[in-house]
Amino acid sequence: MKNNAQLLMPREKMLKFGISALTDVELLALFLRTGTRGKDVLTLAKEMLENFGSLYGLLTSEYEQFSGVHGIGVAKFAQLKGIAELARRYYNVRMREESPLLSPEMTREFLQSQLTGEEREIFMVIFLDSQHRVITHSRLFSGTLNHVEVHPREIIREAIKINASALILAHNHPSGCAEPSKADKLITERIIKSCQFMDLRVLDHIVIGRGEYVSFAERGWI
């Protein structure tokens, strides 16, 4: 009964002020629904976030880490992973259906949803038309933990095939640090030069890390 009474607080707050008014602890408590013996759901949610550092840390955790939380089993782990996957697919659909790009923030959120948590470097390209509306996006290259081989010709071939006029490049750093390497800068320059011959514009190259990002355009490098 105590857990149910505690849960009414986030629910009532959500109904009155909207879901965005909930704190991370309250949002997680709403999902968990019940606590464990001797621990109400809000306390459990607070401890989980403290253990994992943030919602990001929680949603990207592995089962070995998650199973150490007393009273929380594989079912809740599967549900949390399902939430993360739902978010990724939501941004995937939103990117296709809400063209043109609504804002740099939406682009970044989409890329974070697609690349966060990947164990290998993935190089993605968002293809845009002359009005900067999204045509499609594609994971063109996949590499290792700290390297991905990128071929500008493949990018250009795909752009020509779908009649794209502009590109947004993106890749992830599984290490968590989003700061671009020298190799990242060099391949970006190569892609830009190759695209110029085909009258293709590279609007940005965004590097996704663990809870952080770097935009070449924001840095003034493009």
UniProtKB/Swiss-Prot annotation:
Encoding gene, per UniProt annotation: yicR
PANTHER family: DNA REPAIR PROTEIN RADC, UPF0758 PROTEIN YEES-RELATED
PROSITE patterns tied to this protein: MPN, UPF0758
GO BP of this protein: proteolysis
Superkingdom of the source species: Bacteria
Record bears the keyword NADP: no
Similarity remark: Belongs to the UPF0758 family. YicR subfamily.
Coiled coil location: none
Domain MPN: 100-222
Protein name in the entry: UPF0758 protein YicR
Keywords, ordered alphabetically: Hydrolase, Metal-binding, Metalloprotease, Protease, Zinc
Binding of Zn(2+), residues: H171, H173, D184
InterPro entries listed in its UniProt record: MPN, RadC_JAB, RuvA_2-like, UPF0758, UPF0758_CS, UPF0758_N, UPF0758_YicR
Listed CDD domains: MPN_DUF2466
Motif JAMM motif location, chain numbering: 171-184
One example GO MF annotation: metal ion binding
